[in-house]
Amino acid sequence: MSTVTTPSAPKVGFVSLGCPKALVDSERILTQLRMEGYEVVATYEDADVVVVNTCGFIDTAKAESLEVIGEAIKENGKVIVTGCMGVDASVIRNVHPSVLSVTGPQQYEQVVNAVHDVVPPRKDHNPLIDLVPPQGVKLTPRHYAYLKISEGCNHSCSFCIIPSMRGKLVSRPVGDVLDEAKRLVKSGVKELLVISQDTSAYGVDVKYRTGFWDGQPVKTRMTELCQALGSMGVWVRLHYVYPYPHVDELIPLMAAGKILPYLDIPFQHASPKILKLMKRPAFEDKTLARIKNWREQCPDLIIRSTFIVGFPGETEEDFQYLLDWLTEAQLDRVGCFQYSPVEGAPANLLDAAIVPDDVKQDRWDRFMAHQQAISAARLQMKIGKEIEVLIDEVDDRGAVGRCFFDAPEIDGNVFIGLDDGSTVQPGDKIMCRVTDADEYDLWAEML
């Protein structure tokens, strides 16, 4: 008697680099491959082909991408490259000529077709037996997910090359966004992190046209989108918010508990001169007034931001202006980067003095020390307060979670001691009382 053997599923390795927006691209590619019967494996040696989703935002990210591509070639040999760095394929092929395919961001079908060329899907594959969840393959923990609402950006910040890599703003249909959010919530997601290159510009490209969701008209606009997301009973957190005037409309939704009182606004600098060189909004005095007004309307509001020090033309006076502005603004969560020139960025052509590396480092150190003192003082005010915590991890030492003012990966944590026999699991929301704080994290006891 002859034995019939069933061919094994083709295996794909996947490395996703860069920002949450790239992570969502990776999830979309992996979902399509899983629907076609591919198995996703965790090691190079087990894979029939490896896909590397690259980051090309700054030169250090490009260097990391090239290093990972080289590692994949060495360990596996069959490598497909996609993502932001793939916009200029020659940069990759000059270093790694053996890569099988190079595509740019959002070119999902081309990536999948490239995988087909290397290792075709099984002809007898039945997509009905794969059990790919309705929300697709997710690379985040089960209890939170990134919700990408648009691609591209209409701004021309002089330090950035995102528009050249991802194009102009293209908003997703509001009904599609809300359908995806609903599927994620149904699958157990407790927190939706709304992302794009410019979240607050959502709908500008389609003139805020009216779409439909659940049979009701909904404008393709940030405020209306947040109102709808706020009806789903989960945390809704906004990232990459450009400080347009209509952002003011979101504050009442936060005060009413519809969405989290958390704004991630990359101010980048405060000096009017540097903001002008960056081609960013240069109304720092009005920004301070807006922050004050926002906090009057929503006292719990948490503001996160990022800044660049050492930008061409930045003087000690400009830097001190930034420190003074931080003192006035009293931001809660802040990141800082030393300026790094990016190939193709307009800032490279500025007629402005280059800041020496040692001065950049000194200013970064001073910036971080200055902001740490502000952050520590603001977190000290949380001691004794009751907070709701979303649990991310549980081990024999206790639980690690986040409250409404902590985004995953980039902000602080809440550390909670647990009694023996505790049933707390990742994804649970529990009430706690804050007992201690430092400049980044909180410690709390379960109520």
UniProtKB/Swiss-Prot annotation:
Domain spans labelled MTTase N-terminal: 10-120
Annotated GO CC locations: cytosol
GO biological process: tRNA modification
Cysteines joined through disulfide linkages: none
Sequence similarity: Belongs to the methylthiotransferase family. RimO subfamily.
Class of this enzyme: transferase
Name of the protein in question: Ribosomal protein uS12 methylthiotransferase RimO
Residue positions binding [4Fe-4S] cluster 1: 19, 55, 84
Cofactors named for this entry: [4Fe-4S] cluster
Cofactor note: Binds 2 [4Fe-4S] clusters. One cluster is coordinated with 3 cysteines and an exchangeable S-adenosyl-L-methionine.
UniProt subcellular location: Cytoplasm
Family annotation (InterPro entries): Elp3/MiaA/NifB-like_rSAM, Methylthiotransferase, Methylthiotransferase_CS, Methylthiotransferase_N, Methylthiotransferase_N_sf, NA-bd_OB-fold, Ribosomal_uS12_MeSTrfase_RimO, rSAM
Main location (coarse class): cytoplasm
Catalytic activity line of the entry: L-aspartate(89)-[ribosomal protein uS12]-hydrogen + (sulfur carrier)-SH + AH2 + 2 S-adenosyl-L-methionine = 3-methylsulfanyl-L-aspartate(89)-[ribosomal protein uS12]-hydrogen + (sulfur carrier)-H + 5'-deoxyadenosine + L-methionine + A + S-adenosyl-L-homocysteine + 2 H(+)
Superkingdom of the source species: Bacteria
Domain (Radical SAM core) ranges: 139-377
Residue ranges annotated for the TRAM domain, each copy included: 380-447
Binding of [4Fe-4S] cluster 2, residues: 153, 157, 160
One of the record's GO molecular function terms: metal ion binding
Keywords from the named record: 4Fe-4S, Cytoplasm, Iron, Iron-sulfur, Metal-binding, S-adenosyl-L-methionine, Transferase
Record EC number: 2.8.4.4
Species annotation: Pseudomonas syringae pv. syringae (strain B728a)
Keyword Flavoprotein: no
Free-text function comment from the UniProt entry: Catalyzes the methylthiolation of an aspartic acid residue of ribosomal protein uS12.
